[in-house]
Amino acid sequence: SHRRPRARAGANRVSSCDVSRYGDPVSSTPRCPSCRRFVYLDTLVCPECGTEMGMQVIDRVFVALRDGRTTGEDGTWFACSEREWGCNWLVRDDAPAGRCISCRLTRTRPEQDDTIALEKLAKVEEAKRRLLLQIGDLGLPIVPWYTTPGGLGFDLLSSRSDGRKVIIGHANGIITIDLAESLDDVREAVRVKLGEPYRTILGHLRHEIGHYYQNVLIQDDETWARCRDLFGDERASYQEALTRHYAVGAPQSWQDSFISEYATMHPWEDFAETFAHYLHIVGTLQTAAAIGIRLDAGASTLRDTDV
């Protein structure tokens, strides 16, 4: 499937809200609050000492939980009500339905009795939390769909639930993801069909949120003109560009001017692909820093790689 173009947003400038004001960047090594063992961002229980934990995203730290809560100098935090589906973020007692900001950004999800789809949802929600942490690192505004028209939201749907095709894409702030792509065999089949070098859920999210931020960050004519100088005129027909891309492919020597073959299709996709690959690179460097990998700047044996 191909990605839908996003609709051009209005000229209303949006401002950041509390959900994007995070503390230390995620590159700081996450550790168990009890035994200080390195843990992963999706950890619910420390594999070393058994401490139940949750992430307090404002200060970007894991804290120990007792009976699903923790109390400190900044008050009491509670486990997100979606913890049974893998969410380890914490909330205040006034959080709507006890759900964290990441879970509340999901506008549409499978029905509660669709347990198979909900298992897929848990994997996609994990990737979404990683995305939001990274967006917070960059200081980008996160304005929810339920507070502002055109705000950020996610429709997480499964094409396996009712047989209807789900088109991955972005429109007016809402990012749509097909939960079926959380299955490795489904995602790999699509990757091979489209001739892509790799295909991941987190990659989809990073790409589609690039469409969202193109509208959020570029508001005035001068900035749009600079954007068009770099990426091309986004007012060109998307449908014609889509048809041409899948008929003839990327131009020769595309590597000289574009980050990926898909970026050659249309200026919208060039921006979104560039945004996504920037997040790929930053995420790789953050992971390297967290686990202690060091690069030798003087090494001469490094070769060009496909990022």
Language-model segments: what does each one mean?
Residues 1-25:
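N-terminal amphipathic/basic-hydrophobic helices that include classical n-h-c signal peptides
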Residues 125-184:
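Auxiliary, metal-adjacent structural segments of Zn-dependent hydrolase domains
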Residues 17-143, 147, 300, 307:
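N-terminal low-structure segments adjacent to metalloprotease catalytic domains
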Residues 199-219, 272:
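Active-site recognition of the HExxH zinc-binding catalytic motif
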Residues 37, 263-307:
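Pan-zinc metallopeptidase signature
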Residues 136, 140, 214-222, 276-284:
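Hydrophobic/aromatic-lined pockets within catalytic cores
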